[in-house]
């Protein structure tokens, strides 16, 4: 059973496609001011997301399936989560990067 899990995990890692060149600014670790929402997007096309709100939490660890404008879907097979990006990555005058995903303003920390 453990071996099957390891093979499945390796197979799932292999499903990620690199970020398109025009979306490379999405890559990095992003966090909300209260640290309750965190997302890491790798250049290889994987998402590690957590949203820890009082009484409700969610997390996603999956490859990015596709982009639709600024939004993106992450998941495997028929299971997927849409991330609504209302502000794509943008650098302010001080050189800090921000974006808004699912209504949460996130700052790039790495």
Residue ranges of predicted features:
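Edge beta-strand at a domain terminus
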Residues: 98-110
